[in-house]
């Protein structure tokens, strides 16, 4: 059995797609980001923006990685080499990876639209930190960013759950008990 084939079988047998080692940290960070929206302090809102950005980027990377494994598992025993540099990718590149490798079509276009809007808003706010003369206006921009981030996160969480549902269905069809 080839190494790549073994990796796919182990990924399925060990149900690695269902593991989320970052879940408790992600929940904690999302709570902090949500709290920052209610804080009138601009520094707190900027901190919330940074947290939202990292949480959403990491969630998207995890979804892309899981999607790649799903593609490999779905065509198994045929193998394909799909290697992406998720660690070194910019957020825009990770969005492109999602566009290319999304395995669930439901809400795909809405998620892509939301991610692009989120990235554009982030760039706008970050690059305009010095140009927005009124700090109150900056607070409004940061609150708009936070609202968009929250909506984006909800879509990503739902999408991730649908990918996991697809893995459950694939497990049932393959009959993994013969590999255990």
State the predicted function of each range.
Residues 1-16, 137-140, 144-147, 151:
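N-terminal hydrophobic targeting segments
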Residues 2-93, 109-120, 127, 163-179:
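Amphipathic alpha-helical interface elements
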Residues 36, 40-43, 106, 140-143, ...:
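Short coil/turn segments at secondary-structure junctions
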Residues 44, 48, 82, 86, ...:
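A general boundary/transition motif marking the beginning of the first structured unit of a protein
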Residues 69, 100, 104, 127-131, ...:
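General structural signal for alpha-helix termini and helix-helix connectors
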Residues 94-109:
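Short, solvent-exposed, charged loop/turn and helix-capping segments
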Residues 109-167:
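Charge-enriched, short contiguous segments at helix-coil
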